UniProtKB/Swiss-Prot annotation:
Residues 5-70 are annotated as: Repeat 1. GO terms for molecular function: ATP binding; ATP hydrolysis activity. It comes from Porphyra purpurea. Keywords: ATP-binding, Chaperone, Chloroplast, Nucleotide-binding, Plastid, Repeat. ATP binds at residues 210-217, 549-556. Its main location: plastid. This is ATP-dependent Clp protease ATP-binding subunit ClpA homolog. May interact with a ClpP-like protease involved in degradation of denatured proteins in the chloroplast.
Amino acid sequence: MFERFTEKAIKVIMLAQEEARRLGHNFVGTEQILLGLVGEGTGIAAQVLKSMNVNLKDARVEVEKIIGRGSGFVAVEIPFTPRAKRVLELSLEEARQLGHNYIGTEHLLMGLVREGEGVAARVLENLAVDVSSIRAEVIQMLGENAEANVSGSNATQARSKTPTLEEFGSNLTQMAIEGGLDPVVGRQKEIERVIQILGRRTKNNPVLIGEPGVGKTAIAEGLAQRIANRDVPSILEDKLVITLDVGLLVAGTKYRGEFEERLKRIMDEIKSADNVILVIDEVHTLIGAGAAEGAIDAANLLKPALARGELQCIGATTLEEYRKHIEKDPALERRFHPVVVGEPSVEETIEILFGLRDRYEKHHQLTMSDGALAAAAKYANQYISDRFLPDKAIDLIDEAGSRVRLLNSQLPPAARELDKELRAVLKTKDEAIRAQKYETAEQYRAREMEIKAQIAAIAQSKKNEPDLNLEDPVVTEDDIAEIVAAWTGIPVTKLTKSESEKLMQMEETLHGRIIGQDEAVIAVSRAIRRARVGLKNPNRPIASFIFSGPTGVGKTELTKALASYFFGSEASMIRLDMSEYMERHTVSKLIGSPPGYVGYSEGGYLTEAVRKKPYTVILFDEIEKAHPDIFNLLLQILEDGRLTDAKGRTIDFKNTLLIMTSNIGSKVIEKGGGSLGFELSEDQTESQYTRVRSLVNEELKQYFRPEFLNRLDEIIVFRQLTKDEVREIAELMLNEVFARIKQQDIQLNVTERFKERLVEEGYNPSYGARPLRRAVMRLLEDSLAEEVLSGKIKAGDSPVVDVTNEGEVKVLLGEKLELLT
């Protein structure tokens, strides 16, 4: 209770305890509270008593006459008498009746008068005070204070009829009159439907149902604005739209029945005022609110009033919460009438952004271009898939405004350096003053003034620049694109010259790591260029390929190279080894376990990875090893760029590049379509590749369903590696070994003879480049490891690896290099 006491009321209680000590009493009674009220001197109670000729001296005399003096021994903690406790309870009740959420001296005085049987009442009678007129005097004085502090508008007078509601809610109508609400654009149909339901005789309670961020609360604000503008039917004129904070209503209810008491008071106030429309955002929070230890929850307390039409309530909640909480309670559900609030279209969102533009321009102190607003709606719809319009578009313009303002408010680099120097000079000057080195301090003072003058000059020159500060900074389409790119990782910004050159030279860049396989490199490069320029189909993935061919020719390596050069790093690639998905039940690993199974809350590996990183390469390695049911899952990804996970969320694959590798047809490729064992001319090689490709396609058709193959953009058959290509790959592998051993400060070289030996042992058309890797490990890495461990090669050496005439690999140092013959 005491937390609601004003400072003056607390002072009265302290003075009452002092009076008890003065008279030697071990209790605080009504008479001590009266003496405290008189002694406080500045509160409303003291002023009222003073106007009735009550002073502290006379009051003390009367109290002493009635109760006398005590024993003299007084405890540290002085308890209240039962009558004094009753006075405190009555003062709380008086405060509530007057609609005050505090207890002041005036309430304590009215509590004393209302109690009427204590020593205080007898003291007042003895002092010839008209006790019956005290309450009227207090209320009159309270009224004068209120008139001095509050303007007497109709809205304020009406609001004072509902003090409890005012404490636990916000008056949207008043905020609309004062211009404190954002303008509501569109939504006329939904607002009309809400007005229609509010006009009913009974069960006049609409509930706004929609996804998060579509503008449910805005509809309630739109209704408040229409009432403020008197643009409503006569049945709703002069109504007050008040939003109730359920959390605040529950907060601080320590004792049983306190929550119910608050809610009943609110309902009584609404019933007596007869002009309140209650708005409860997140209306599902009513269910269970305040229901502790068998108490009745808020929803059950409100049910009778909602059904009889005594309470007009607008609820707002999401589809999921409505289904989970309100539909489970048919008795509550029948009292509400759903108004479905759909997500606005991109065009409607642009109109909403134009309506809100002034508010955001004023807040950020800049200008927002028409193109920026249109881009915000378009990009939000296209690239941010897990949220809803117009909320995500509004967030884009808000953050873009913040970014542009911050960029324009920063000092130039030269001024920032000077500012840093100024702080150092001030610190040194203060140290010199503390050390009483006043001459040194004077020198630093001169430097301080010099730096301040330089900073002022730079700021002035920036202000005088013609194109920068004559007008407010402008938020452009590029700024919106920067924010989208920062949120999602998808490059939406316009192409820079360096990036354009990088994309044009993409094949050359990939060929630095991938030897041969021109068809695959060209197909992947074209897909990336198409997506980056914005010419790809916005409703499909960037591209989808099957890389088919023999083992070890660079199918997975090409995907790694692509992820490394154009998506940040190899780690940014989402890699799924399909040999892990050979059983039917492993489908759940991709999209998440169904409800009731272990791991439901964790989500699927594929869907969660794409939600976190929507712009990436997805590699389905060894696709033919997967269970056939996996391919059914891929159909909607390949066609529509979307997949629904176990929780019902739609995951967007429209900015992913899908690559599947397969060894299907490797037997056909190994046979090479005939002419095996003979050196082929270029024309023969090309015709052989064409024949092999058609045979591989036939094999794929036998293994995969037509609807799966038909959704792929391209099936690329990798060629077998030629001896020259294996030689180039050998150079790459040797360079990797050189780089690794250079970290130990050893400069390694190999002879041409060793390279030829490496190619001879590592070349196998059927197995690609993997035998070469084994040859490097056996011939080079093993020999080097033995020499390093034996101590023959140490840091700083420059060994050379060669092959003797007998075919033995030798690691030679400086003095033995003459053996190289």
